[in-house]
Amino acid sequence: MKLFPLEQLSAFPTCDLSEVVAGARGLLAIQHYSDISCREIRTGFGDDRQGLEVQQMIEIGKAALVTGSYKLAVQWFLEAEESSAQSEDHKLKARLAQLVAEARETHDGHLVTNGYIQYNARNKNTYSCADKPYDQDLQSSEVFKLHRTHYEELVKFSSRDVDLARENISTNSFWKCIYIGLDPLRRKLCQGVVESRPALQCQFLHHQDHFLLLAPFKYEEVKRSPAAGIILEVAYPEEIEKVMEEARGEMITTTLVDYNQQGDVQDGYTSRRTSKVTYRSEKSLAEPLSGWTRRIELATRLDLTSTKLSSENYQIMNYGLGGAILTHRDSDDQGLEDPVYSESWHNGGPRLATVMVWLTRVPSGGRTVFAGAGLAVATRPGAALVWWNIRSDGSLDSRNHHTGCPVTRGNKWIANKWVKWPSQMWRYPCSHNRGQHYAGLNLNRVFV
């Protein structure tokens, strides 16, 4: 993957250190998913080659430690150490040597304990990693060899249908499959090295509606199970411009609902998502958003408007250079049995479906990847990607954990519309058959 000129990174090279810390997370995401080296970033790109200063590299290394990117932390501290080799500042050199030693110790500790850099409750945003320890003695230890073998088996097992295998493995092993075992495939899908299958089927959606028979929607089926497809011409260029213009002045740093070590719902893991967000309802921006909602309803036959809880407000998001979101899910099956879950029954029930409207084209990066389904989808302005978050029996469809790959060139804008489950009972009824999935958007074929 080609990373474009360093000067496009808003945090580099003319900025204060607080901006470096803010931009470092996106930079680390780009490195993880594109395999670009610290040296390439340090020395700069393009005709106007402007590199990084030592203190900037130290701050990036610290950010890598905080986010669990221990291998990159070591690499950035080593890069800073090499860059300062000619310096006469002995205190700086001693400090860098200490940082390198501490980062290596942390890195090796995780590898020897787990065989990989662990995704856990303490570091929810940790990137997986299965490299060898820096300590030569630890590389040959029986403990590390045992855990490394387990990791390789985990990756091999994750290449199967993890959703179907969920009942045959422990909960802990299942989540390791989702977040750790699938990471090598996820990275390839983000890079475009592994191409997803082309559209399985293209069709006109009209649902025997008299109006749509004259002007049907174009629909591309990109995955049959779990069902996912693209509806074309949901948003028009002038509408997109208006929504983006209105949203720009109200964007805030995104947080993400997650769980703490006690299993309670909490938010604030902002390091898992590097983006800006605002929310808009059809009432607050009626002209374009009401039109989008109406078109989505006509194309999908989902109920978005009959009650206040039929769907959520539009989530308008902007991902700049390096903007990404790590693997997550849009709904949760806890809500199906536990009404206490704050985002579930008290607010209209679980999210049955996600409708992601693309507002801009991203020249490089920015794919939406479903590693469990082997699917990567690139942006298409004005079109909407639709997928089911839960199966027709009410259980979570694990293959729809997805990742927003880092933007490596350009700017990514999307508008998410989450559709609540209870309001869809008449049009997309429940199934009594355990494990059955919803089909695509053809009402003559509701289940698969």
Predicted segments, located by residue:
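Fe(II)/2-oxoglutarate oxygenase catalytic core
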Residues: 1-384, 390-448
